[in-house]
Amino acid sequence: ADIVFPIHPRTAKIFANFGISADNLHIVEPLGYLDFNYLVKYAKAVITDSGGITEETTVMGVPCLTLRDNTERPETCDIGTNELIGTNPDNIKPALDKLFAGEWKKGTIPPLWDGKSADRIVDILVNL
């Protein structure tokens, strides 16, 4: 499987210094929000240490492996496509094996993530 890794230039230098490369590893410069979300939409999965992207993966139905022990967005784990796999690198392969075997959970979009927040806010303000 191809791996696309949007990476900060400083981190890219570290990769180069250590000689980290692989034929299926495509290191690209950081992407803008829309380009990044396009990449996420067509990804088999996302591996991240960020809390924010877990919202996008949940909405898009893309499996997300989060390299953390906790999250500020527990709903992405509870009903979304996100799973906390911890900070031990040895946890990545078993999680990917589960994913590629078709055993990853099928998440749903949280009820209030329906794109109607502004309508609800206006209704509340109008009725004050």
PLM segments and residue spans:
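Nucleotide-activated sugar donor-binding and catalytic core shared by glycosyltransferases
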Residues: F5-L128
